[in-house]
Amino acid sequence: MGKYNLILSEYLSFIYNSQSAVQIPIYYSSNSELESRCIEFHSKCLENSKNGLSLKKLFIEYNDVIENATLLSILSYSYDKYNAVERKLAKYARGKPLEADLTVNELDYENNKITSELFPTAEEYTDSLMDPAILTSLSSNLNAVMFWLEKHENDTAEKLKIYKRRLDLFTIVASTVNKYGVPRHNAKYRYEYDVMKDKPYYLVTWANSSIEMLMSVFSHEDYLIARELIVLSYSNRSTLAKLVSSPMSILVALVDINGTFITNEELELEFSNKYVRAIVPDQTFNELNQMLDNMRKAGLVDIPKMIQDWLTDCSIEKFPLMAKIYSWSFHVGFRKQKMLDAALDQLKTEYTEDVDEEMYREYTMLIRDEVVKMLEEPVKHDDHLLQDSELAGLLSMSSASNGESRQLKFGRKTIFSTKKNMHVMDDMANGRYTPGIIPPVNVDKPIPLGRRDVPGRRTRIIFILPYEYFIAQHAVVEKMLIYAKHTREYAEFYSQSNQLLSYGDVTRFLSNNAMVLYTDVSQWDSSQHNTQPFRKGIIMGLDILANMTNDTRVIQTLNLYKQTQINLMNSYVQIPDGNIIKKIQYGAVASGEKQTKAANSIANLALIKTVLSRISNKYSFVTKIIRVDGDDNYAVLQFNTEVTKQMVQDVSNDVRETYARMNAKVKALVSTVGIEIAKRYIAGGKIFFRAGINLLNNEKRGQNTQWDQAAVLYSNYIVNRLRGFETDREFILTKIMQMTSVAITGSLRLFPSERVLTTNSTFKIFDSEDFIIEYGTTDDEVYIQRAFMSLSSQRSGIADEIAASTTFKNYISKLSEQLLFSKNNIVSKGIALTEKAKLNSYAPISLEKRRAQISALLTMLQKPVTFKSSKITINDILRDIKPFFTLREAHLPIQYQKFMPTLPENVQYIIQCIGSRTYQIEDDGSKSAISRLISKYSVYKPSIEELYKVISLHENEIQLYLISLGIPKIDADTYVGSKIYSQDKYRILESYVYNLLSINYGCYQLFDFNSPDLEKLIRIPFKGKIPAVTFILHLYAKLEIINYAIKNGSWISLFCNYPKSEMIKLWKKMWNITSLRSPYTNANFFQD
């Protein structure tokens, strides 16, 4: 503890280094005597600083506070004005500023010109192409770097080298930024025209990326990669990331496999010592050399040299450097293009008639058959979800934009909003709600567009379709996904699997007579050629399905779905171009439909099957696996002879030729040892993930507050670190300090302490120890947690007003009426709460809540008031358990090989000792009998929180709950009277606790919690049958042991003698655990 607080104090004296600056620490304690000393100390500090007296004497006088109480926050004030950054920066700006080459990029605006050249007037200016979209500023980032540099200028040995490397790189950034002056941001952290007009347009986003890169430099190789990317990304804003990461798709095919992990019948990873040689035809090397040439043409020197050097022996030992280059390339920032260019990208592909009609027919038929296969069971059995598809759609309607702003009346309040949920309510109130009519998206009503930006790829457009499309597609797509869940081919959806399972699937069949074909089909998904066969395949499938049932409601659902496909075959889009809005006929498929993911997966599976059926005419092979994962598909083919160079080359050329016959511009590769797809890559029998999450630039702006973004920043840092890209932790902590500070007045700021930001409360931002989620059990920790719980949820006047309006109330009661067969307060309240929560995405409401939150927080950070909360948190449970455990040293041998080389040492060690897991632990209650029973008769999906509440009710209340949701009385009676009900109690509690303990997030998702090696370190004498208590004791012990091992790199064993008398008490408590939502949990969820 305390590293953060120490840095915070140093940071404050670095930032506010004038005579007028004062730092006042604020302490608190759960001990009432000490607490009164804390209050006394604080008021005397204020008194002294008002009178300009030193605080030193007080620090001595109140030593007991400083020693024994807990730091709550630091209050700092300074009358210093802004030019501080510029002054400090000048010291580092000793180098030659970079000059942008203004001819590198094809599109004029992607060249890093002076802003006024790209946008001659303020009216024409937009920051959308360079907006870092993050609630922290360039000046803060510069400050954070300079703080780190100043703090480390006296480092020695290896640390000194790191300092010099970073200093050298920062000199480039500082000199360039200093030449033009630091751009000042406005209150919303945006950079306006008058600030930017005389500066290079991409200066800010480039500087942010560069700072992120230079603060991730440790070794000499890091330095070389970073220097090259920093210098070149100043000019090349379009293709740099793509150029640098392209070779990876070939590199994975060059490394021999010497021992790997494969999936066994039990879906676990097991080691296999097989040896598979990489067989690489000359053609492949030629392609690789072409890529390296392209890199050199773009001015890259060191990076292609590193790759070239690695090629001499292609060893897996040195492969992590290749992985590093691949990850680093993403950190040059997002490529943000104008919407017009993004849309035209799909349209400028020449439409040729010269295609293989036969293949198209086969492709369409495969899509048709798959759609039928997915839906035939629910359709034949007149599934209630397909009958009540409209209601199901309404219940899960999102609060995203509906494409146009409308004036809406809620009671006396009139507001403007674009949100779907509000439009639905308004339409219902005014009789305009007609879900049976799917509005056209033709030339009269073109589709408004959203955007998706990603590093190293072109900007993609997203359809913002009217909500009718969502309602029409929701239920059918849900059924498709249920089918995909138990179909291994759909890697993305396969039941509770994680990426390690997919890894073991690929390596399993690799051998000297097999090859793997992997294709990136992202170009195909958005191509015009895909549109007709794709939509027609779906339509034909729906026609077949409609003949399988006589239920009018099911037929209506299928017809509406079909109508969305027909409408979208003739789609027009509207694109703002300057002041005019262009209408363009858009023949391609774009994201934005509910079906996007599911339908693309179906199409990509159909595509690879079509291709394989073609090449099977020429070769004899067995298809061992076919997988589709998002934009990528891959298949392992087993031949009856050993694979030779010539075979690989022939198959490769035939596959490409086959794709070409469908005019599919895709990147198809064949290898014998590895694959590379968007989500993961396999090389030398080991699995790698791209650590490419940008920290200081974001894709888009959302409803997030600064606190939320600080948590997201930390969460991104953790994910990158697990994947092999490490940013300096002190720098991340400094960013958290900056982003979580709260301004009281112009010169007064409050900085929360580590305890506030890491305690498991509604304000949690990060973990005090990376990878370890701590649940504080000391008096002070529980005290502060209680204090924060008292101000957790804030009211919003606007939201209350909307919720009180008849429009809103009628909508809720309409939903409840359609859903419920009899009164059910839990569900009705639940729906009302969900709908009210959706209002949060309406900016004025989230702003209002945020202001209330901040002011409550300000009070709390200056003096915590606890109110005696009767709520029990997971901390209370663990606090009760902890005293009964005794620990002693233990030893576990390393017994598994490494298969994920990028993991940090301490995490790697644990996997090598206890093994990894290839599945997600069920934490939403969906496997419980009650959840299955409800979904059998109702479209309502209770959350894990609701199930947890319901399952602990009296039996007759559970019966009423079930009956009100339309479950027949006989089924409800049977359920409550059976053993299943008591099993469910345990099962749901288990899920709920797993959910609270974030067992599927961070690095915990990698560990096998059921490992026998872990179990044997725990001894808990069995006393009486309370499975729930046994469960929590074991889980606590496992987490303690794992956390200890992460921290110390050694093992302990735990013995617990839990008194029987306490067990029943604990069991009762376990039914009242409150879940805490925080920016931290939100960021974890956001990672998903």
Swiss-Prot record:
Disulphide bridges, residue numbers: none
Enzyme Commission numbers on file: 2.7.7.48
Reaction(s) catalysed (UniProt annotation): RNA(n) + a ribonucleoside 5'-triphosphate = RNA(n+1) + diphosphate
PROSITE patterns linked: RDRP_DSRNA_REO
GO terms, biological process: DNA-templated transcription; viral genome replication
Main localization of the protein described in the UniProt heading: virion
Top EC class for this record: transferase
Classification via Pfam families: RdRP_4, Rotavirus_VP1
The family this protein is said to belong to: Belongs to the reoviridae RNA-directed RNA polymerase family.
Protein name: RNA-directed RNA polymerase
Native source species: Rotavirus A (strain RVA/Human/Philippines/L26/1987/G12P1B[4]) (RV-A)
